[in-house]
Amino acid sequence: MYSDTFDLKALIRPVVDFPKPGVIFRDITPLFQSPRGLRYVADQFIERYVEADFTHIGAMDARGFLIGSIIAHQLNKPLILFRKQGKLPADVLSEGYQTEYGEAFLEVHADSLCDGDSVLIFDDLIATGGTLLAAANLVRRTGAKVFEAAAIIDLPELEGSRRLQAAGVPTFCLTEFSLSEY
């Protein structure tokens, strides 16, 4: 276990004007280049959820897969992949949503979940909440329930966490950034 003074934000690189002017992109690749940082992040989520009552972990394409798979492995939970449109080979459920950059579609295999399942949905970052709201809608369409939405980073000024909570989805993030914070 690491001390409370571990500086997670130091491992999240701000990239100005990416993918478009005026945006500060939060690049988590330095986190994956730090064994200590990656262990810290994984341990924080594992400690939070080790005794939680859910059946599956749903990870968002693509950066959500990276930590989501570690958490699923450590907690011995099935991992459900929520992919961008056209990436899954079998029958899918699809949900459209708005991102901070435009419109997109999220898909999940139609047979991934069923009544009685409870899913922790995971992504690297909550901005507008569009991706995780689409995932929550897909989970509910299968008859399953959303346990919680979790992410490494929250951008509270974009109100994604608020939108998720208003839709009945509790949220948890390890850290947050203001839109102007470097």
Swiss-Prot record:
Its EC number is 2.4.2.7. One of its GO terms (molecular function) is adenine phosphoribosyltransferase activity. Catalyzes a salvage reaction resulting in the formation of AMP, that is energically less costly than de novo synthesis. This is Adenine phosphoribosyltransferase. The lineage of its organism: Bacteria, Pseudomonadati, Pseudomonadota, Gammaproteobacteria, Pseudomonadales. Pathway: Purine metabolism; AMP biosynthesis via salvage pathway; AMP from adenine: step 1/1. Homodimer. Pfam families: Pribosyltran (PF00156). Coiled coil: none annotated. Belongs to the purine/pyrimidine phosphoribosyltransferase family. GO terms for biological process: adenine salvage; AMP salvage; purine ribonucleoside salvage. HAMAP family: Aden_phosphoribosyltr.
